[in-house]
Amino acid sequence: MDIKGTTRVCGLIGNPVGHSVSPAIHNNLARLTGKDMVYTTFKVEKGDVASAVRGAYSLNILGLNVTVPHKSEVIDSLVDIDPLAKAIGAVNTLVRTDKGYKGYNTDICLLYTSPSPRD
C-alpha cells in the first residue's frame, strides 16, 4: 500500500476497535478497485467523540464508521442526520459534506434485506 498526500482516509471510531476486520476488508477492496484510499481504526474514549469528529473533519477524513459505544453520542457532532438514523437514535456511518459530517444508520438496512428464518 502506497500512502501519499493524495490518499483519501476513512476509518472506524469506537472502543474497542483493535479486533476489527474492517481495515483488512476496506483496504483490500481499495487495492482491488484501484482506489487511492486507506482505512484504519481510531480508538476513541467515551466523552471524546465530539473532539474526535472535529479533528477528523479538520484532517480531511472522507468518512467514518462508528461502533459501540458511540452510535448515539456521535449524533450531537453532526451537521446533518438522515431521518431514519434520527428516528432510530443511532448512527454508524459519517459522510463528509462541505460543512461537517452527515450521519446515517446502515445497520437497519440489514434488517430489511436479511433473509427471514423461513427463506
Task: Enumerate the predicted regions with their spans.
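Phosphate/diphosphate ligand-binding glycine-rich loop within oxidoreductases
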Residues: 3-110
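Conserved small/polar residues in nucleotide/adenosyl-binding loops
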Residues: 112-119
